[in-house]
Swiss-Prot record:
This is Minor capsid protein L2. Interacts with major capsid protein L1. Interacts with E2; this interaction inhibits E2 transcriptional activity but not the DNA replication function E2. Interacts with host GADD45GIP1. Interacts with host HSPA8; this interaction is required for L2 nuclear translocation. Interacts with host importins KPNB2 and KPNB3. Forms a complex with importin alpha2-beta1 heterodimers via interaction with the importin alpha2 adapter. Interacts with host DYNLT1; this interaction is essential for virus intracellular transport during entry. Belongs to the papillomaviridae L2 protein family. GO terms for cellular component: host cell; host cell endosome; host cell Golgi apparatus; host cell nucleus; viral capsid. Disulfide bonds join 19-25. It is found in: Virion; Host nucleus; Host early endosome; Host Golgi apparatus. The gene is L2. Minor protein of the capsid that localizes along the inner surface of the virion, within the central cavities beneath the L1 pentamers. Plays a role in capsid stabilization through interaction with the major capsid protein L1. Once the virion enters the host cell, L2 escorts the genomic DNA into the nucleus by promoting escape from the endosomal compartments and traffic through the host Golgi network. One of its GO terms (biological process) is microtubule-dependent intracellular transport of viral material towards nucleus. Its main location: virion. The lineage of its organism: Viruses, Monodnaviria, Shotokuvirae, Cossaviricota, Papovaviricetes. Keywords: Capsid protein, Cytoplasmic inwards viral transport, Disulfide bond, DNA-binding, Host endosome, Host Golgi apparatus, Host nucleus, Host-virus interaction, Late protein, Microtubular inwards viral transport, Phosphoprotein, Viral penetration into host nucleus, Virion, Virus entry into host cell.
Length: 524
């Protein structure tokens, strides 16, 4: 049976040519020929934003093209500071030769009619006729490495010497200097100084003047002397080249954070697990220095430091009472550990184990106990704040019978009052003219004008009474403040009434208290 011959089907291009004019082309043929398929659209739209040229994709090499591959987040570095490469064109120099080839040493024939005596002349001298012109050609070839330097040959007229002009074998090379600047955002140069108070120039010179202003509080009678005696603390002005390093908060522990967290978590699991560990708060201060004295009665060894784990041997069959009931049946007491409570206190902890039960095989069974004690806080000293100035309006009334000292003497006998008087002829006169009424007289006159008296309970509302200013013919006393300091005065305006008394011996102010406690008489 003869096999039928396979007929080649028409290609997509042939079908498109025949059916395009008639308009009977299938959609898949049109999309494939006109490149309007979904894959073609993705490539068209994606190629406008992404360029994959030169990467060597689908080449089988895997080298990344001409530039190679770089890790993510990095890129090719830029070489800064390299010497620029000067590009020089390879120009072939043009050779210029002489116009005529003439021997340098020319022999002139002798005329038969010339005399037989030959005059000897200097042949090295150059004799150029005035009518002849000398042609000199200078050639400066382009400096190359593999080119030879040709020496031009210059010829003159007849009966003249040749002049050779040799060019400089190393002519000056033309160079070009270029400058490239790269911006580094992590480095910044300050090219100007910061304008500061007291600075008169942009350089590091500071001029400090005085008398530009300010306010003086208080003062003294001689301001020139006080100004000369005052000492001012000098402060250095920062320069434009100076800087300060701000240090952060120093760490509270020397252990790294990761190790500290791991150790703290394991410590909390061992100490604060209430299902496996019994929590006991110790109040005895011996727990900090000698915890073994709380477990059993023993002698103190000053050479032994109780900073390690301690083991206590005891017979369970024998009943022994410990010094502290909380440390009953303790056979092991661990080394101290220090931690911080949520309230900020320092806690000293020791992990112990009790041996409450003993089996027939000799095994001891007991619970783990967490003994801890919180160190109390150290309160700061309460210091009384002192006032830095004298404030007006603060008045203190001192009651003499309460805060005074009494001396029991007989004023009718002047003997005890003459203590310290030297014996002299005037001593008898003093005893004779002595009068007990003179002891009650006082030359100083107190002035209470402008003062305030406050009545009432300090917890309740108080009443303030302003004492008026009086003008009487009495003696006036002056108080001079002889100490230096700051006086703070609050401006107040008071409406006082001036009263002129006709009789100066009459008391000025009489104040009566309606409350229980008696009556008091104040005389200025």
């Amino acid at each position: 049976m003869a096999r039928s011959r396979r007929i080649k089907r028409a290609s997509v291009t042939d079908i498109y040519r025949g059916c395009k004019q008639a308009g009977t082309c299938p959609p898949d043929v049109i999309n494939k020929v006109e490149q309007t398929t979904i894959a073609d659209k993705i490539l068209k739209y994606g190629s406008s934003g992404v360029f994959f040229g030169g990467l060597g994709i689908s080449t089988g090499r895997g080298t990344g093209g001409a530039t190679g591959y770089f890790p993510l987040g990095e890129g090719p570095g830029v070489r800064v500071g390299g010497a620029p490469t000067i590009v020089r064109p390879g120009v072939i120099p043009e050779l210029i030769g002489p116009a005529d080839v003439i021997p340098i040493d020319t022999v002139t024939p002798i005329d038969p009619a010339a005399p037989s005596i030959v005059t000897i002349t200097d042949s090295s001298a150059v004799d150029l006729l005035p009518t002849e012109l000398e042609t000199i050609a200078e050639i400066h070839p382009v400096p190359t490495d593999n080119l030879d330097i040709d020496t031009p040959v210059v010829s003159g007229g007849r009966d003249s010497s040749a002049v050779l002009e040799v060019a400089d074998p190393s002519p000056p090379v033309r160079t070009r200097v270029s400058r490239t600047q790269y911006h580094n955002p992590s480095f910044q140069v300050i090219t100007e100084s910061t304008p500061l108070s007291g600075e008169s120039a942009m350089a590091d010179h500071v001029l400090v003047f005085e008398g530009f202003g300010g306010q003086n509080i208080g003062g003294s009678r001689n301001a020139a002397i006080d100004t000369a005696q005052e000492s001012f603390e000098m402060q250095s002005w920062p320069s434009r080249y100076s800087f300060e390093l701000e240090e952060g908060t120093p760490p509270r522990t020397s252990t790294p954070v990761q190790r500290a967290v791991e150790s703290l978590s394991s410590l909390r699991r061992a100490l604060y697990n209430r299902r496996l560990t019994e929590q006991v708060a110790v109040t005895d201060p011996l727990f900090l220095s000698r915890p073994s004295r709380l477990v059993q009665f023993q002698f103190d060894n000053p050479a032994f430091e109780e900073e390690v784990t301690q083991l206590f041997e005891r017979d369970i069959e024998a009943v022994e009472e410990p010094p502290d009931r909380q440390f009953l049946d303790v056979v092991r007491l661990g080394r101290p550990t220090y931690s911080e409570t949520p309230q900020g206190y320092l806690r000293v902890s020791r992990l112990g184990r009790r041996a409450s039960i003993r089996t027939r095989s000799g095994a001891q069974v007991g619970a783990q106990v967490h003994f801890y004690r919180d160190v109390s806080t150290i309160d700061s000293d309460a210091l009384e704040m002192q006032l830095l100035g004298e404030h007006s309006g603060d008045t203190t009334i001192v009651q003499g019978p309460v805060e005074s000292s009494f001396v029991d003497i007989n004023i009718d006998e002047p003997g005890p009052l003459n203590v310290g008087i030297q014996e002299s002829p005037l001593a008898d006169t003093i005893e004779e003219d002595f009068n007990s009424a003179d002891l009650l007289l006082e030359d100083a006159v107190d002035d209470f004008s402008g003062s305030q008296l406050v009545f009432g309970n300090p917890r309740r509302s108080t009443t303030s009474v302003t004492v008026p200013r009086f003008e009487t013919p009495r003696d006036t006393g002056f108080y001079i403040h002889d100490t230096q300091g700051y006086t703070v005065a609050y401006p107040e305006s008071r409406d006082t009434t001036e009263i002129i008394l006709p009789h100066p011996d009459t008391p000025t102010v009489v104040i009566k208290f309606a409350e229980a406690g008696g009556r008091f008489l104040f005389t200025p």
